[in-house]
């Protein structure tokens, strides 16, 4: 068997940490090391890690005592310690199916791929599943095939960390950016640029828990800076694959970043007044040169409310989303609560 290193940053995750660790210990593939990296937690997370490390020698507790904190720099500590042939990243508030490692490693060995991707189930904190995201396309892709149908690859392959198993020798020289958000996208972009073959499993093994108000869904002062760094990595990947002459391949990530900024700015958790929200969005627009891509996105790929939002952006009416976003959020949340009470 070939060892896999599972890297899990831990920060104030005591409510969900046991479930995450237990889901790893239940794996049908036993040759792994679970690296728990405590990032200065102020709750009981560290003690939970200590207790599990005493019970199972495959579990190692590491500490991020550096001046740089956050998920990126914390994962880098795990990468420096990892000894596995394969690398897998997992968050401390999620959980995985028992067969994840077995299926992903079998696929990687059978296909000789550099990266194996699998599906994700989206879960609410109430225990209700809200859907899943699984690959819909050719199961094995060479780099040249990604070039031929880049937009399909981009739309169908979300840039998460935790729906991918990496071959260690492929990503050995890649490190995480020390940014508050988007470090996972940056790493995924750099890893994809190194991969010659990507294999897909159509089953969903990872359970992502959506936590209202969590750091990745919350506006912070560095959000625009993080999106700018993310854009740099995305452009580097696309340029290495397709060059710079055609702006169309860049339109997908450009819209992804711009819409993500709009989503965070229009959330009820964003404290900025309307004028400041527009100013922040203008910063991102200038960083990315967004107007170059505004009208060339293939809008027929989007449907329903999302398409409406994309069309508003196309015609420079994103201020409407910023203005009505908080109201929309409250209405949707109220409807969701009513539906849950009926169940």
What annotation goes with each model-predicted range?
Residues 2-5, 23, 33, 186:
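Cell-envelope/extracellular polymer assembly enzymes that use nucleotide-activated donors
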Residues 12-26:
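Short, well-formed alpha-helical segments that are part of the catalytic scaffolds
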Residues 30, 38-47, 66-68:
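A conserved acidic beta->alpha catalytic loop
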Residues 64-82:
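Glycine-rich, basic loop-to-helix element that forms the pyrophosphate-binding segment
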Residues 87:
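Short aromatic/hydrophobic "clamp" motif used to bind/position activated sugar donors
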Residues 92-200, 206-224, 243:
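Donor-binding/catalytic cores of nucleotide-activated saccharide
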Residues 205-211, 217-245, 260-293:
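Catalytic core of nucleotide-sugar-dependent glycosyltransferases
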Residues 269-343:
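Membrane-interface aromatic/basic loop that binds lipid-linked glycans or pyrophosphate carriers
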């Amino acid at each position: 068997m070939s060892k896999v290193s599972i890297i899990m940053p831990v920060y104030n995750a005591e409510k969900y940490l046991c479930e995450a660790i237990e889901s790893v210990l239940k794996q049908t593939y036993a040759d792994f090391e679970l690296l728990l990296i405590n990032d200065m937690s102020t709750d009981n997370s560290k003690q939970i890690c200590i207790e599990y490390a005493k019970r199972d020698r495959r579990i190692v507790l590491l500490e991020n005592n550096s001046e740089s904190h956050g998920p990126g720099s914390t994962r880098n500590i795990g990468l420096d310690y990892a000894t596995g042939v394969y690398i897998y990243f997992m968050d401390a508030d999620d959980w995985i199916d028992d067969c994840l490692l077995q299926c992903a490693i079998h696929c990687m060995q059978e296909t000789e791929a550099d990266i194996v991707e699998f599906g994700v189930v989206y879960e609410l904190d109430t225990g209700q599943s809200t859907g899943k995201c699984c690959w819909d396309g050719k199961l094995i892709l060479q780099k040249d095939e990604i070039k031929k149908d880049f937009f399909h690859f981009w739309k169908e392959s979300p840039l998460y960390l935790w729906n991918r198993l990496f071959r260690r020798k492929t990503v050995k020289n890649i490190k995480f950016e020390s940014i508050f958000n988007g470090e996972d996208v940056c790493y995924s972009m750099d890893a994809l640029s190194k991969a010659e073959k990507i294999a897909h499993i159509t089953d969903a093994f990872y359970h992502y828990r959506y936590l209202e108000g969590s750091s990745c869904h919350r506006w912070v002062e560095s959000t625009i800076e993080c999106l700018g760094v993310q854009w740099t990595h995305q452009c580097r990947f696309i340029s290495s694959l397709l060059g710079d002459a055609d702006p169309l391949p860049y339109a997908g990530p450009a819209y992804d970043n711009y819409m993500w900024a709009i989503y965070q700015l229009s959330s009820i958790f964003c404290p900025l007044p309307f004028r400041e929200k527009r100013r922040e969005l203008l910063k991102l627009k200038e960083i990315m040169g967004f107007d170059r891509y505004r009208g060339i996105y293939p809008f027929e790929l989007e449907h329903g409310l999302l398409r409406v939002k994309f069309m508003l952006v196309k015609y420079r009416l994103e201020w409407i989303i910023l203005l009505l976003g908080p109201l929309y959020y409250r209405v949707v949340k109220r409807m969701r609560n009513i539906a849950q009470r009926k169940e």
